[in-house]
């Protein structure tokens, strides 16, 4: 394996460790969580639309999402392994027979709609993703609770140490005052 592919594989593994994208394909309506930096502030912005294409492979893979914003079609290309993509949530599965849905650019209204895939495979994928999402939320919540408990224990230990130090200082002060009398 040459150096470039090795570096790409390392970067892909690093990003995969942070977040795992669900399995989606053209025709699916997705909500992409994108990290946006405005000045010094960074926030996560949702971009919801229909996946009209997936291109590339490996580390260079990307997908195009199209949405209609104020009557104007807007398309955005997201690299799959971009650190700016926080996550992808599948809103609904589309039933299409093409890999590239560029024909949607010329369509408006009802003709631009994509029927929902209600097949067994789509239901299975949706259930798996829902279970994975719930497990991830439970894990994050458990981490928050553990962090809160650790912080409470640390605060209690700090307060106990402060009380002990104050009691020792008071005892030393009392010991100093007693021999003088």
UniProtKB/Swiss-Prot annotation:
PROSITE patterns: RIBOSOMAL_L19 (PS01015). The gene is rplS. The keyword Manganese does not apply. The keyword Ribosomal protein applies. One of its GO terms (biological process) is translation. InterPro entries: Ribosomal_bL19, Ribosomal_bL19_CS, Ribosomal_bL19_sf, Translation_prot_SH3-like_sf. Pfam families: Ribosomal_L19. It comes from the Bacteria. Residues 162-173 have a biased composition (Basic and acidic residues). Coiled coil: none annotated. Signal peptide: none annotated. GO terms for cellular component: cytosolic large ribosomal subunit. Belongs to the bacterial ribosomal protein bL19 family. This protein is located at the 30S-50S ribosomal subunit interface and may play a role in the structure and function of the aminoacyl-tRNA binding site. This is Large ribosomal subunit protein bL19. Keywords: Ribonucleoprotein, Ribosomal protein.
